[in-house]
């Protein structure tokens, strides 16, 4: 499989790591689970994500989307290829104050989103204990909520639209999410 991974790496604009050090860094999240991935991909473009999905399908391995890795339940730990979208998919794309929504990429940090929204008198309600590093893609994947969820509900209840990559083997990698925001 190492030769196939080498060939894949040559086709990506982003990075693909399969050395022990990087795999060790991604073998855990904030949970107590530990499993070494086959490789770690840091895609730079949507085309990179398409190539990763095709590779995983051809070689019958899994893709595990990951942002900050703050989950306490091991959702982003596995023996497939970790796809870390936090580095290059981290932009706030559009704000519509009138309709009360914002479109973001999955690597946007929840607290940084609220800092962006604050001057507009708006905020994104769902909160986690790791809101200063939790990213929207992970919050969507985990349906995050927190101590204020009684008032502001969970993440899924704020989700209007998700643009994602899908494959016939069930891979879903979110590339943008449109979420509702609340006036202060």
Q: Language-model features: where?
A:
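Beta-rich nucleic-acid/ligand-interaction surfaces
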Residues: 133-137
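N-terminal accessory segments
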Residues: 1-30, 55-63
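Conserved PLP cofactor-binding pocket of PLP-dependent enzymes
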Residues: 66
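N-terminal glycine-rich flavin-associated loop
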Residues: 8, 31-63, 85-128, 140, ...
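Low-complexity, simple-sequence tandem-repeat tracts enriched in small residues
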Residues: 181-182
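A short, glycine/Asx- and small/polar-enriched loop/turn
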Residues: 34-35, 76-81
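Conserved PLP phosphate-binding loop immediately N-terminal to the Schiff-base lysine helix
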Residues: 74, 130
């Amino acid at each position: 499989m190492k030769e196939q991974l080498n060939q894949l790496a040559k086709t990506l604009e982003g990075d693909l790591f399969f050395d022990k050090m990087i795999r060790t860094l991604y073998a855990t999240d904030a949970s107590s689970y530990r499993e070494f991935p086959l490789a770690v991909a840091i895609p730079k473009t949507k085309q990179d994500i398409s190539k990763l999905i095709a590779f995983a399908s051809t070689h019958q391995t899994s893709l595990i989307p990951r942002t900050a890795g703050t989950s306490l339940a091991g959702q982003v730990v596995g023996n497939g290829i970790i796809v870390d979208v936090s580095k290059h998919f981290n932009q706030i794309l559009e704000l519509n104050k009138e309709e009360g929504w914002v479109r973001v990429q999955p690597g946007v940090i929840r607290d940084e989103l609220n800092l962006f929204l604050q001057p507009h008198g708006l905020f994104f309600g769902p909160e986690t204990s790791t809101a200063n590093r939790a990213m929207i893609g992970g919050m969507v994947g985990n349906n995050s909520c927190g101590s204020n969820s009684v008032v502001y509900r969970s993440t899924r209840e704020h989700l209007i639209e998700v643009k994602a990559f899908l494959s016939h083997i069930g891979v879903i990698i979110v590339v943008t999410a449109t979420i509702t925001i609340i006036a202060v």
